[in-house]
Curated annotation (Swiss-Prot):
The protein's assembly and partners: Tetramer of two alpha and two beta subunits.
Record lineage: Bacteria, Bacillati, Bacillota, Bacilli, Bacillales
Similarity-based family: Belongs to the class-II aminoacyl-tRNA synthetase family. Phe-tRNA synthetase alpha subunit type 1 subfamily.
Name this protein carries in UniProt: Phenylalanine--tRNA ligase alpha subunit
GO-annotated biological processes: phenylalanyl-tRNA aminoacylation
Amino acid sequence: MEARLKELKQKALKLIEEAKELKSLNDVRVAYLGKKGPITEVLRGMGKLSPEERPRMGALVNEVREAIQTRLEEKVSNLEKAVMEAKLASETIDVTLPGRPVETGCHHPLTAVVEQIEDVFIGMGYEVAEGTEVEKDYYNFEALNLPKDHPARDMQDTFYITEETLLRTHTSSVQARTMENNKEKGPIKIICPGKVYRRDDDDATHSHQFMQIEGLVIDKNIRMSDLKGTLQVFVKKMFGEDREIRLRPSFFPFTEPSVEMDISCMMCHGKGCGTCKGTGWIEILGAGMVHPNVLEMAGYDSKEYQGFAFGMGAERIAMLKYGVDDIRHFYTNDVRFLQQFKRA
């Protein structure tokens, strides 16, 4: 039995040394140390030995089993290490190789235009004010000189959520809140960009949701000439120094007097073409002097303070600036369209 144990040990250790993969080692473990292996058979035959031989043979069996088990564990560890090293070597990245260029994205054209407009007015000392898109009827209409029975409410079809809550139809509501929240009732100089909503049918020039940017200035001794000068600076910054402006009388409930502002056509330079419908002028925004009722409702003394306001659609400005003929292009997310506006 002792000779057999030594022979089993030699064969097992030889097979372990020759093993090239983990599966082979597992086969050796099962063959020699498993329940049906020769080591187990030797242990079962211990009962046939004399009491004097059992301790010595038991110690020898344990020695052989531990030697095989220890060598198996060492070999498994070595093979696993070799496998890991081979895997790491195959996945090694040569950091000296030239990298692949990362394709950069770009601003959405509307985002770019809004930021350009903000930059122009911030350069003139304006602050950017924002507000909620879900608004109370009061701030969207009543605080802007549009009481519940005012016929001008029909000018804007509105998405109502409840009787007193709606999706704002203009960012003028931000102006109303800013004036009301100005506890000192002092000067204000803000622009208000944001999304607005109207029940329009979507077509080439209309959308049920669009971006609007409005401006408000409140101070003492504000005149119409201040409004005109501000808009002249804006137009020349956005469309070029050669652009001219003209103001036409109009009507808005929250301003008096009210005007529409046109700029000289950038396609024909005022001579008349299809873009400007032969007039040489293109309308871009509405404006006017803040109505005294609006000032009074916000807590201002309309005899001491005056103001002007203006509002424009970002899509309208972007369409003119980039020559886009359909407002829907801004919302279809066609990559071919958007990539044209990638900044250098």
